Structures are given as structure tokens and as C-alpha cells.
Amino acid sequence: MSIKYLIVLGIRPDIINYHPLVKELKKRKCDFIIVHTGQHYSYFFDGLFFKQLDFPHPDYHLKVGSGTQAQQLGKLVQKFEIVLRKEKPDLVFSFSDANTSLSGIVASKMGIKVAHLEAGMRSFDWRMPEEKNRRLMDSISDYLFTPTLSTEQNLLNEGIPPHRIFRVGKLIYDVLDHFKKEIDQNKILEKLQIERKDYFLVTAHRPENVEVRTPLKNILETLGVLYKKYGKKVIFPIHPRTRKSIKKFRLKIPSGIITMNPIGFLEFSKLEKNAFCCVTDSGTVQEDSCIFKVPCVTMRISTERSETVEVGSNIVAGLNKNHILEAVDRMVNKKPNWKNPYGKPQSAKKTIKILESRSNEILSPKVWWNHPKIEKNLSISEYQKSWKNKLLPDKTFN
């Protein structure tokens, strides 16, 4: 009897990072289904990526959409439970830290095994919604697949049992390695009439950066200074949220900045790989630039990709204009000779191999127990003894 896997995704990075996992599952002829929560959905943010990555069309689309945290999570929990009861998977994959990842909580409560990919990442900034999601998912997952030694250590420090932790590297490294030829052959540089290492690549989309006037104004002004100081164009694919805020706050885009709508995975990866420097608030760009050996400056006050700072590929500069400019100057004047902290591009292969080796554990009958009936005049010690006798051993949590 083989394991039935369920992959749940909801945002663009999920589609990209799940690619090697789906490829490995197909190669092994495993049984799997794909559920798209619809946390984010548009042609540019999903459809184009499905096409470029040759990603299977989801079996279910929950159409959760945007809204408040409570609205989004409420719809996710209700709709995802229906799919789980119908499909009865043996294991659910949950990726990283978006709200979609919390679908794993529903699976766990139903007695279904959960594997958390990109586990152990920590910004240690409790103000970030993603930090809460990461910690919640790591605490309830049965199998935690970490990308680096430091993420593994984070879990051990939090008391996660070692037998649930597996260091396998980064899925994005698998993706970039697989599509290396397609990325190199992409013609986005010619289309934009720019040369290799003669432009900055910028992304800004986080709500705290673009939904408040002052930080967004600072970012735009900083980009204008970069163009004047270095004489290099600034390529800025604008997230819909950012474009909406620029219009709302009536901000001007400085000269030298080339703006565009969101672009495909291959186009963006080609721009990343050949940039003079990446200036971003994106977690994925921090990883990509580290792998591509392109200097990166992060416009945030914290990062869960601490390994990029440790190896020297990235500086977390905050949102102060002078601090960002100083960080850029430091990064572009150093040799990109840092070590890749992500091992080899074999993360998906290792992940599935580990899970398949534990098929007996994953496929074992689900154990349920009923709370002991409370009798009148039962002492606390007698009640505790009765409760303990009702528990059946579960080797997974020993």
C-alpha cells in the first residue's frame, strides 16, 4: 500500500518551490493531489507560473481569496476539511509561512500526518504574521524538513524532538538548478535593452513597507538616489499592492526607474541572476541572490533567512534611506565569494526518500481515544490515573 500525498499551495512561491517535489512524486509514480487555496490568485501570480513551470493543474481550488486574517483562515479551515474528508490523504505537505500553511493544523486535528517544508526558519520578530505561522506549523508537524543547520538548531532549541527533524536543503535551489538552461536563454534583458550587471533589481511588496506613505516614499526616493549615484537603471516589477499605494499617496516615481507589471518566473530569475545588486523586501529574493552570487540588500528590520547574512550575501538595512544606501555601497564593493549555505540541489529527492522510508509509520491506523468518563466523588489522583490508562502509545510522539 502506497502513501497518498496532498500538496496544498496558495501563493506564487508555493508553486515555484513545489515544482521539484511534484517532479519527484511523478518520477516515483506516487499518488498525490494538489489543492490551491486561492489565498492569492491572478494570471500573473499563478497562471503564468503554472504554464512556465509545467505545473499540474490543481485538483481543487478553494477560492479563499483575500480579506481579514479571520475571514481568510475561517474559509480555509472549513473548505479544506471538506477536501480532507473526501480524499483521505495519508500525509499533507505544508510549505513555509503563508496563511495557507495553516491548513496543516486542520489535517493534524483530523489525525493526518503533516510534513512542514522549510521548517525552522525564524526572524525572531513576533510582529510578523509569518513568524506566528512558522512557529505554529513547526509545533504541530510530524515531519520537519529544514533547509540549513541553523534552522535545524532553531527547532532543537525550541524542544522539537530530533527524530522529527530532517535537514534536506532548499527546494528553490532544486528549481533554479533544474531551469538553469531556460533561465539563461530567456530574452528579458534584450527586451528591456539592459546589459548584464548594469542595473539594480528591486522588489517591494510587504504591507508595512508599501501600505504606509512614509516608508514607501523613502523607498522610491532611495531608488532615485541609486540611479543617480551609480548611473545604473533600476528595474522595478511593481506588485499590485504597491502600485495601488503609489497612486493612493500620489507619489512620483523618480527618473531612471523602469517599472513594469509582475513578470514570469523565468524572466524574473534571469533579472536576478544578472543584476548588479538586488534591493528587496522579499524572502525568496534573498535566497535566490545568495545562490546566484548577486549582492542583496534587504529593506526590512528582520529576516528569517539569517543564513544569507551569515555567509555575507545579504545585509538587512531597515527602511532608513541612508542605511540602505550605505548597505548597497558595502555589498557592491565586496567580492561575491560567499559559500552557498543550501548544500546540493537534491532537497525534493531527499524529502520523498525519507517519507517513503517511513511509510509503515505514515500508513499506520489512526489512533483515537475518548476522554474518560468523570465519575462523581473521583479524587484528582484517581482521575489522573484513569486518564493515563486511557492513553494508547503512539511511537511517533515518544
Where are these regions (language model features)?
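Nucleotide-activated sugar donor-binding and catalytic core shared by glycosyltransferases
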Residues: M1-K232, F236-I238, T242-N398
